Amino acid sequence: MDQKDCSHFFYRPECPDINNLRALSISNRWLESDFIIEDDYQYLDCLTEDELIFYRFIFTFLSAADDLVNVNLGSLTQLFSQKDIHHYYIEQECIEVVHARVYSQIQLMLFRGDESLRVQYVNVTINNPSIQQKVQWLEEKVRDNPSVAEKYILMILIEGIFFVSSFAAIAYLRNNGLFVVTCQFNDLISRDEAIHTSASCCIYNNYVPEKPAITRIHQLFSEAVEIECAFLKSHAPKTRLVNVDAITQYVKFSADRLLSAINVPKLFNTPPPDSDFPLAFMIADKNTNFFERHSTSYAGTVINDL
């Protein structure tokens, strides 16, 4: 074998920025067993039937989407030779497994532990047009333009846009003193996704050549935001719990944050959310403990674009 190829057989630091994000993720690992989801059963009777249906739908989507992310991670890893990037994605896959297990716990809780009822619901709901629109849009974009750069834009949109309204809708439960454990899990998952979107933006900026035209990036962001807002509006109940207008504005604000992170001009110029928005604290650069109700400190500082 040529001597220049021998580096394949040992680890050599090449991407200090990605290595730092991997280290941050490792230092903040948590498990689905850290909280007891059974504590949230008491809140089920506090929801109206429409609200219960809404949150069942949200967690059906999140559970399915988490699997979609894991599938995409495997394909993205193959695009790079740097071991730091490979190692980062292995770490992210481990975290996504925890997310999937948590979503399963919460989903079953929303069906009062009735597994057969959960299966019946998911079999029908997974084909809901609002969910399928996201999946089909992604599949179409990957099929039409399989460039590495555009795949990364799509990954940024999956992690940074297609989860936003769901995270916000769950966070509104906290504002109403409901589902304390579910909200704790939501805090941790959304903060993990902050690291994931940061990593995707970092890899796109520093390790992906030949970026798409700004007009193309704006087109993809515009379509993704439109789909995400329609997703929320199609199922959000008329309820005291969720402010649909505030969430749709937050989706647009998040899109602008992500565009800025990849050095592309903003598209929506939407102002930041009001101080009472349940995810507003996540856009601040905080040095406080991310695990506010957890005994393990969440190390480091992450600015969340979600």
From Swiss-Prot:
One BP term from GO: DNA replication
The protein's name: Ribonucleoside-diphosphate reductase small subunit
Subunit structure: Heterotetramer composed of a homodimer of the large subunit (R1) and a homodimer of the small subunit (R2). Larger multisubunit protein complex are also active, composed of (R1)n(R2)n.
CDD domains in the cross-refs: RNRR2 (cd01049)
Cofactor(s) required, per the database record: Fe cation
Enzyme Commission code(s) on record: 1.17.4.1
Catalytic activity, as annotated: a 2'-deoxyribonucleoside 5'-diphosphate + [thioredoxin]-disulfide + H2O = a ribonucleoside 5'-diphosphate + [thioredoxin]-dithiol
Gene that encodes the chain: RIR2
Purpose of the protein: Ribonucleoside-diphosphate reductase holoenzyme provides the precursors necessary for viral DNA synthesis. Allows virus growth in non-dividing cells, as well as reactivation from latency in infected hosts. Catalyzes the biosynthesis of deoxyribonucleotides from the corresponding ribonucleotides.
Ranges annotated as spanning the membrane: 153-173
Pfam families: Ribonuc_red_sm
UniProt-annotated location(s): Host membrane
Topology in membrane: Single-pass membrane protein
Top-rank taxon: Viruses
Binding residues annotated for Fe cation 2, in chain numbering: 96, 159, 193, 196
GO MF annotation list: metal ion binding; ribonucleoside-diphosphate reductase activity, thioredoxin disulfide as acceptor
Amino acids binding Fe cation 1: 66, 96, 99
Family, per entry: Belongs to the ribonucleoside diphosphate reductase small chain family.
Gene Ontology CC terms, in alphabetical order: host cell membrane; membrane
Catalytic residue list: 103
Keywords: DNA replication, Host membrane, Iron, Membrane, Metal-binding, Oxidoreductase, Transmembrane, Transmembrane helix, Viral latency, Viral reactivation from latency
